[in-house]
Amino acid sequence: MWLRLAALAALAVVPCAMAQDVPPQTVLTLDDAIARVAAQHPDLRLADGQQAVLTAEAQRDALRPPLRVGAEIENVFGSGPTRALDQAELTVTLASVLERGGKLDARRTLAQARIDALAPQRAIARLDVLADVARRYLTITAARQRHTIALETLAQRQRTVSAARQRLQAGASPESVLLTAQALQARAELDRDRAQLEVATARRQLALLWGARSIEADQISGDALQLPAIPEFEVLAQLLDSTPELARLNNEQRLRDARLQLARSQASPDLDWQVGVRRLEGNNATALVGNVSLALGSAGRAQPDIRAAQAELSLLDIERQSQALQLYATLADAHGRYRAGQLEVARMREEVLPALARADTAAERAYRAGATSYLDWAQLQAQRSDARQQQLAAAVEAQSALIEIQRLTGQPFVVTAETTP
């Protein structure tokens, strides 16, 4: 697949002296770019920080209610018999809350569901970031190939200027033809310079993804005209069942189940208890004390939260159906755009461009021999340049669709051979 383009092969036959004088050029592949972004992009590191937060919250939610120690003294520093400490009553207590209804287990389940929900979120973020890397890498490759087309067009215009000058010197053509050819050559030079600037801008945009100002590599591997074979739409549609977007909804169901369980546990009131020892100084005696309390109406107060949790859970099926339809429609659109671009690129490579190349050669011979006009040759050159631009545009559209297909399915489609017409 486009996302897995192989690196450019090094030249095998090079004189030894030249190999010593010229340092080898470094090549940045798409896999290299992905590795750099995966190690440094903040969106991918964000999930690790979120997991640390949720783990700490899970440890907090797993704690039982604390024990409370208290002391109370009565009948001291008053008047009459309580003027001193003779009638003092000192009570030391130990108190806590007995949770009922499975609140502790419900909190633990909810905390774990939140942690588990990070996995599909991390997978979605990774696919989104890698798709962004692939798109920016594709932008570089497309700009580089537009620069190549501009160089070829410029070479054509230079040949035209040379031929027009020869015919002018021979008195077989007016000066206006030469001036027109020179103007078209200047426009071709402008297209070349603009394409070169686009390459530099695209390289900087890619480097920003891993926090760099520019790409140190000399070359960027890959060919936008490489379009691999992909399965039929029905086969790709089956892969959507395991996509991270739907996996996220499965984890969301467990999360909402846990919220419902926690809401139901609130219907059982907690039992507040307290036990202690009381010292009766006036009677020189000791006694045990204790009390329990239970909140009333907990079941009624818990009903709104229970109904809200049930409503959220029932909405999940609708959300899953909506998400599946959206993924299905996006995949269908991307698959159709890829097939159309693949067909156009192949037809241009096999039929249109070879025919225009032969026609260009024949028109050049005819013009130099005086058998055709400059206008016919110039129009043919423009058609050939436009055809190459059209082929590249179709290839870029197909590659963009292919990146979207991989983002949806998470499956690579590898190009087995490079074919650059």
Predicted regions and their residues:
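Amphipathic alpha-helical coiled-coil segments
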Residues: 44-61, 125, 129-150, 159-161, ...
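Short flexible linkers and secondary-structure junctions
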Residues: 20-151, 157-161, 172-178, 186, ...
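Bacterial N-terminal signal peptides that target proteins for export
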Residues: 1-7
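Periplasmic alpha-helical coiled-coil/stalk elements that build and connect Gram-negative outer-membrane
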Residues: 125-242, 334-341, 345, 384
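Short, solvent-exposed, mixed-charge loop/turn linkers that connect secondary-structure elements
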Residues: 21-24, 28, 193-237, 270-272, ...
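N-terminal signal peptide c-region/cleavage motif recognized by signal peptidases
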Residues: 14-16
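Outer-membrane beta-barrel domain signature
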Residues: 85-86, 179, 190-193, 197, ...
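A small-residue-enriched
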Residues: 35-100, 121, 210-212, 237-319, ...
